[in-house]
Amino acid sequence: MTLISVAVCVRNGVDWIDGCMESLVQQSHSPLEIILVDDGSTDGSEEKVKQWDTHENVTVINQKPLGLSAGRMAALQAAKGEWFAITDIDVRPEADWIQRMLESSVSREDEEVVAVTGRTVFGQAKDTISKIRSIEIESKYRSRPRITKLANGPCSMFNRKRLLEIGGFDPSWYHAEDMEVSLKLIQDGGIIVYTPNAVVNHIPETGLKRFLNKRKRDARAHVRIHRRYKGVKHDFIGSSWIVLWMVPLLALGSFGVSLYVNNVLKLDEQNLESFYLALTREVLLICLLPLFWLSSYIRSDLPKKRLRAIFVLTSWSIVLWQGILLGYLDCLLYTSDAADD
């Protein structure tokens, strides 16, 4: 049987450790090597990690708070399996997760499968944040092809030898390390296969501040990705691009409304009719229709708490633009980025 190594990293996630580890030790595939990395936790996670160190299939690594990418690299260097799987501490893989990915790792003619990625299902709580996140992730999987360009961090498996050959996970990358290694593997001639029946369940993502901070990091990291891997057409895209344009569209619509009000107040009755005709042709169609489109989008795809949803989406759009600006600032200052070769 094929030995599979699974790496999971934790920093200050004491309440999530048992749930994740129990789902890993109960995997239907055997043999399995589970590598649990404590990334400088200060909330009691270190003690919980020590308890799991006694399990026969678990190896523990303790490191300073160096980040997820550094933790995964440490696990990769310690791994012995032919395949190296990764997941997150707030994820609960289904019992056949590893088995399903292994079944899809067999290369077809003229293919070299170097990674397999499964499907992450985000749970929903009663709050708006978790519902929006769940809907957004689900939308990304609706039309995902078999051969994909991203081995997602919560639910993927890599050929360990090929992953080491391309340098593994770069510890200097603060985010999107899964995307970086995916693109490197593809550039090296391999393919990544998506298998929808290899499922992991993500606990509901709640809390506006945490949600927005993650989306800002996403945007910041994507700038770096696009700078280093120019011309790549990503196939795992949800509603983020729609959300990105919410702030510009709202600004445009607000401009249309203010222009309308300003001109109406200045017009007399004689010129009012001609003004309305011009306004309909030039201002309403250009500036106000985006607001109707936005309203339709919210009614069709988002929870019933529309005002709260609009606030969350607008905040999301703002932090995406902030992340993009930070990403370009990184380009200028070479912050958190290895020097280009």
What do these predicted regions represent?
Residues 96-128:
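Conserved donor NDP-sugar-binding/catalytic core segment of glycosyltransferases
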Residues 84:
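Short aromatic/hydrophobic "clamp" motif used to bind/position activated sugar donors
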Residues 63-79:
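Glycine-rich, basic loop-to-helix element that forms the pyrophosphate-binding segment
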Residues 334-341:
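Conserved small/polar residues in nucleotide/adenosyl-binding loops
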Residues 23-31:
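Short, acidic, metal-binding catalytic loop of nucleotide-sugar glycosyltransferases
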Residues 23, 38-47, 91:
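A conserved acidic beta->alpha catalytic loop
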Residues 172-173, 179-234:
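Catalytic donor/gating beta->alpha subdomain of glycosyltransferases that bind UDP-sugars
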Residues 247-332:
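Membrane-embedded multi-pass helical conduit in multi-pass membrane proteins
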